Amino acid sequence: MLQVYLVRHGETQWNAERRIQGQSDSPLTAKGEQQAMQVGERARTLGITHIVSSDLGRTRRTAEIIAQACGCDITFDARLRELDMGVLEKRHIDTLTEEEENWRRQLVNGTVDGRIPDGESMQELSDRVNAALASCLELPQGSRPLLVSHGIALGCLVSTILGLPAWAERRLRLRNCSISRVDYQESLWLAPGWVVETAGDVSHLDAPALDELQR
């Protein structure tokens, strides 16, 4: 049975400032660096063999810190990027106009084909993150990969594995540097395919972590 660990990046400057990141970027805070080191300490005990990361800066840095702890190489995969939030990226969430807030709500509340102008839909996000996960099935027997990605992207992935719509990710609380695990099982008795073993574990962190845009 293949076990895949899913890690959200460490806290960033824009997380702390309540700014919308999407595929734009901001650096890890000192707290975010510490969170990544604590993930690394946990990862060292898990037998991780591969690290696959979104190619955005905040995930790259998180993956680098984890890789130093567990001695793994990193592969970068753009399919693990965060949801493209279009024209709302870099904006402070409390400064959105009524129209802009409506765009955001339509997207995250599951409106069919909802998207922010110049951004992507939840279905497009779901398609690419699930394809990235499926690539883990091509790794050598005995592999145990760890994927470093983003809050909405990982929430979407876990939701769809559970058979829920992609926008159900808003019902999952995946805090900065939380660890989730999904397994691929082939069984005559259990549901074949991907199953969720754990989601949003923060027991390795020594201080409270942020949810998406939450203080």
Curated annotation (Swiss-Prot):
From which domain of life does this come? Bacteria
Pathway assigned to this chain's UniProt record: Carbohydrate degradation; glycolysis; pyruvate from D-glyceraldehyde 3-phosphate: step 3/5
- According to UniProt, residues marked as the site described as Transition state stabilizer are 150
Could you confirm whether the keyword Isomerase appears in this record? yes
> Which of UniProt's keywords are assigned here?
Glycolysis, Isomerase
Q: Which Gene3D superfamilies match?
A: Phosphoglycerate mutase-like (3.40.50.1240)
Enumerate the catalysed reactions: (2R)-2-phosphoglycerate = (2R)-3-phosphoglycerate
Which cellular components does GO assign to this protein?
cytoplasm
Q: PROSITE patterns this protein is in? A: PG_MUTASE
**This protein's name:** Probable phosphoglycerate mutase GpmB
Q: Which organism is it from?
A: Citrobacter koseri (strain ATCC BAA-895 / CDC 4225-83 / SGSC4696)
